[in-house]
Every structure is written in structure tokens, then in C-alpha cells.
Swiss-Prot record:
Broad enzyme group: ligase
Lineage, uppermost ranks: Archaea, Methanobacteriati, Methanobacteriota, Methanomada group, Methanococci
HAMAP family the UniProt entry points to: BioW (MF_00668)
Gene: bioW
Family: Belongs to the BioW family.
Record Pfam families: BioW (PF03744)
Domain of life: Archaea
Cofactor field: Mg(2+)
Molecular-function GO term, any one: 6-carboxyhexanoate-CoA ligase activity
Name of the protein: 6-carboxyhexanoate--CoA ligase
Organism: Methanocaldococcus infernus (strain DSM 11812 / JCM 15783 / ME)
Amino acid sequence: MRASREGKHISGGERLVSEEKIEEAVLELLRKALTHENGKPDFINIKIEKIDKVNYIKALPIKTITCKNKKEAREVAKKILLEEGIPEEVVEKAFKIIDKGGMRGAAILNLNGERLEPDRERGVRVKNIDTSERLKEKILKEGLGTERTVDAIAIASKVIRLGIIAELCTSDNKSYTTGYVATKKGYFRITNLKNINEPGGRVFFVKDIDEELIKRLEEEAYIIDL
């Protein structure tokens, strides 16, 4: 599902479900589009597509880091990214990208800070993903995160599995200030990674990228499990 107003992205989402659950999933996504805090859309697109092969992989381990404010949170995020070999100036460029917001997908930065996504407005959209019911239940019941964590862990686990070095993300929900950094070491939820009413965004860090990897990010189907 993708929802927008006057061409500006408002919300998106997707599910990977069995045939008998399609109607339930469509209604859930429609409700999300119509009630999103970023505003009422004038355009909603819901696409239903048959998937022949689904990959099942384990979720990245989830760790929450509580920070007092945005400055502290950014330092924590930067430290995690620096440990993955990402230069400080590239991290700072990524912060500027997510703070600008407005992209439907992810920006892609190499270690020289060059933007590599083919379409800078669209970005690269990671699709055909979902979490298993038992993973969702574990996250919510054990207080590991929120519904947004359930959605985000699917993206993070898939992209790291496919060879992305790291991901930096803040939510496009204006009131949700917890963001995350994902690496092969885990999914790090970081509170106050942005301020209330600020936009959000997503950046993937790579050594290099080609059409084949972009295709896999966008098209290969993954269900994330325990």
C-alpha cells in the first residue's frame, strides 16, 4: 500500500499472507492509509501480487538504547555506524538525508558519501516482506518494541541479509521519535533519534550496489521469524 497527498508521500505498508487472509490484510492496510497521523491522502494504491517463493530467515536481535535527547541519540547512532567502518562525514550526510524526509524509499550511500539510488525521489523500496505471527507476538508481549518495530525489523533483517552494511532510519510518523540503526550485530532501537514533528527517512550504507541487488531488495520475498 502507498498513500499520498498532492504527490507527497504520507504512508506505506505491506503484508505477506496466505490467500485466505488477503481480505483481512487489505482492510488493515486501507485503515492505516486513511487514519495516518501525517494526514488524509487523496491517493491510495493497494496492489495484490502472487508470490511463488518465500524465504524464511531469523530476525536480527533487538536491543533498545534509551537516550535523553536527539543529540545523545545521534552520537549513539554514529558510534554504531563508525564501528562498521562508515566514515564520520558519510554518517553526517545520512543524518541530513533523513532529516530532510519526503522520500518514498531509502537513499543509498557508499563509503565515499556518493548517492547511488537510481531515482532520488523514489529511493529504493524494500518490498515483499513480513514478520511471522510468533515473532510479532514476542516483540509486543515481551516489550521489545512496538507495532512499528514489527514492521521495521522485517526491512532491517532482509537488507542486512542481502549484504547492506548498515541501515539508519527514523519514522515518517511525526509523533514517533524512536529510530534505529541495523547492522549484522543487531537491530538497535534508539529513542529520541529525531524530535517530534520532524520528518523521517531511511539510508542504506553499501560498498557498492548494482541493478541485481536493487532488484533483490525490492522483489525477493522474505518472512522474518524467530
